[in-house]
């Protein structure tokens, strides 16, 4: 694992990393996060009773769109041809939260960690936006890379 910043040149200026010499490999990243809310808000989302509509359906589309646009949103990310995006939601009624998971796949020269993290972030933000009219206490927490595979660093588990 490299202990230096690859996005800085020898003068400390930001640059986009050259990846042309890297081999194409199968890449996969799993990101996770949670949004906490009041119990009645969670129930309305679960039963699809929110005034703005299907919260998780819209959040799923937002996650997919955000994942695909990561290269436009984060300055030093390469635009990637993604081969698969999966978005999963899990209701945790005991802790009044929705757990979000985004799995991204590609075959290419660079990883898809930022894409997975962006997907989780946008799903959580979309849920927040669609529920904020009835719940001003929501919290988005624990957005993290859970797993990745492929490339020079191989398999990484972060949970």
Swiss-Prot record:
Active-site residues (renumbered): 129
Keyword Transferase tagged: no
Coiled-coil intervals, chain numbering: none
Catalyzed chemical reaction(s): (8S)-3',8-cyclo-7,8-dihydroguanosine 5'-triphosphate = cyclic pyranopterin phosphate + diphosphate
Biological process (GO), any one: Mo-molybdopterin cofactor biosynthetic process
Assigned EC number: 4.6.1.17
One Pfam family linked to the record: MoaC
CDD domains given in the database record: MoaC_PE
UniProt KW keywords: Lyase, Molybdenum cofactor biosynthesis
Pathway: Cofactor biosynthesis; molybdopterin biosynthesis
Keyword Iron: no
Molecular-function GO terms, alphabetical: cyclic pyranopterin monophosphate synthase activity
Assembly: Homohexamer; trimer of dimers.
HAMAP family reported in the protein's UniProt record: MoaC_B (MF_01224_B)
Purpose: Catalyzes the conversion of (8S)-3',8-cyclo-7,8-dihydroguanosine 5'-triphosphate to cyclic pyranopterin monophosphate (cPMP).
Family membership noted in the UniProt record: Belongs to the MoaC family.
Name the UniProt record assigns to this protein: Cyclic pyranopterin monophosphate synthase
Organism of this sequence: Natranaerobius thermophilus (strain ATCC BAA-1301 / DSM 18059 / JW/NM-WN-LF)
Lineage: Bacteria, Bacillati, Bacillota, Clostridia, Natranaerobiales
């Amino acid at each position: 694992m490299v202990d230096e910043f690859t996005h800085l040149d020898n003068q400390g200026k930001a640059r986009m990393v050259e990846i042309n010499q890297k081999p194409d490999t199968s890449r996969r990243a799993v990101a996770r996060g949670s949004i906490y809310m009041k119990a009645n808000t969670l129930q309305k989302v679960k039963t699809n009773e929110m005034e703005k509509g299907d919260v998780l359906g819209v959040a799923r589309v937002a996650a997919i769109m955000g994942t695909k646009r990561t290269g436009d949103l984060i300055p030093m990310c390469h635009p990637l041809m993604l081969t698969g995006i999966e978005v999963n939601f899990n209701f945790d009624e005991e802790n009044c939260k929705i757990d979000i998971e985004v799995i991204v796949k590609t075959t290419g020269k660079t990883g898809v960690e930022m894409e997975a993290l962006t997907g989780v972030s946008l799903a959580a933000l979309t849920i927040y936006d669609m529920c904020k009219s009835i719940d001003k206490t929501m919290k988005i927490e624990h957005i993290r890379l859970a797993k990745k595979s492929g490339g020079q660093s191989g398999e990484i588990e972060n949970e």
